[in-house]
UniProtKB/Swiss-Prot annotation:
Top-level taxon in the UniProt lineage: Archaea
Pfam families: UPF0179
Family: Belongs to the UPF0179 family.
Species the sequence originates in: Methanoregula boonei (strain DSM 21154 / JCM 14090 / 6A8)
Protein's UniProt name: UPF0179 protein Mboo_1959
Entry-linked InterPro entries: UPF0179
Length: 148
């Protein structure tokens, strides 16, 4: 599998710590007139990122109370449940959320934050069987996925 490249972006100074993970939700209306908005909004909406390095560059920000700090990020792996027949290391999968049972104890693993429906991912690791029985009777495996 190809090595993941880092990207420089801006995040709220309070969040700017190596190892912090976040899901990029897109541009805020307050960003409209900002001169550095391209540096903040250069990530993929709905994807999970991990901060690798914090840089010394700091900017005032209308969104973040203590301003924004430059960081290097990479897309972070996400743990989720998928159909057991798709759970093969290095296989490419297209994520489709077919269950809407919000009361299910595994719901957050079947529809995790940081995964975009319809996009392709690579199964990086198979972590084992689902800890709970699927309410729809499906055979599920817990896997770690990365963007394809």
């Amino acid at each position: 599998m190809a090595e993941t490249k880092t990207k420089v972006t801006l995040v709220g100074t309070v969040l700017a710590k190596p190892g912090t993970e976040f899901v990029y939700e897109g541009e805020s209306p307050e960003c409209e007139t900002c001169k550095v908005k391209k540096a903040c909004n250069n990530l993929n909406r709905g994807h999970r990122y991990r901060i690798i390095t914090v840089r010394s560059t700091h900017h005032d920000c209308a969104v973040h109370l203590n301003g924004a700090t430059a960081v290097e990020v990479m897309e972070a792996p996400v743990t989720m449940l998928i159909s057991a027949d798709m759970a093969m290391i290095n296989s490419k999968i297209k994520v489709e959320f077919s269950c809407n049972k919000t009361e299910c104890r595994s719901y957050s693993l079947c529809r995790p934050d940081g995964v975009v429906e319809g996009e392709k991912y690579v199964v990086a690791d198979v972590l084992g069987n689902a800890s709970d029985i699927c309410g729809k009777g499906r055979a599920l495996k817990l896997v770690e996925i990365r963007p394809a």
